[in-house]
Amino acid sequence: MQIKREAVCGTLQSNDCLVRIVPSEKLELDLKSSVLNEFGAQIKKTVQEVLDEFEVKNAKLFIEDKGALDCTIKARVETALRRANEK
């Protein structure tokens, strides 16, 4: 999938995450989380699974997590990717 424009999904409320994606020359992830020490690796794995599913190679993702569950993170990343691919 080609990232065509910037897109945002989510909120900064408790148990949610805010995902912002922008076009980039390489794949980058900027993750901030209130539970980074405990679940940072799992969050990164979850995000990477969605990126692999959509075959994203060139994008920069900014994710600010407030304790979101994996299913919420997946949904937010997927929605941001779809929005970034719209014309």
Swiss-Prot record:
Family: Belongs to the CitD family.
Function of the molecule: Covalent carrier of the coenzyme of citrate lyase.
Protein name: Citrate lyase acyl carrier protein
A Pfam match: ACP
Keyword Cytoplasm: yes
Stored HAMAP family: CitD
Record's keyword annotation contains DNA damage: no
Assembly notes: Oligomer with a subunit composition of (alpha,beta,gamma)6.
Domain of life (superkingdom): Bacteria
InterPro entries: CitD, Mal_deCO2ase/Cit_lyase_ACP
Keywords, in A-Z order: Cytoplasm, Phosphoprotein
Stored NCBIfam families: citD, PRK13253.1
Residues that span the membrane, as ranges: none
Lineage of the species this protein comes from: Bacteria, Pseudomonadati, Spirochaetota, Spirochaetia, Spirochaetales
Modified residues (O-(phosphoribosyl dephospho-coenzyme A)serine): S14
Subcellular location(s) per record: Cytoplasm
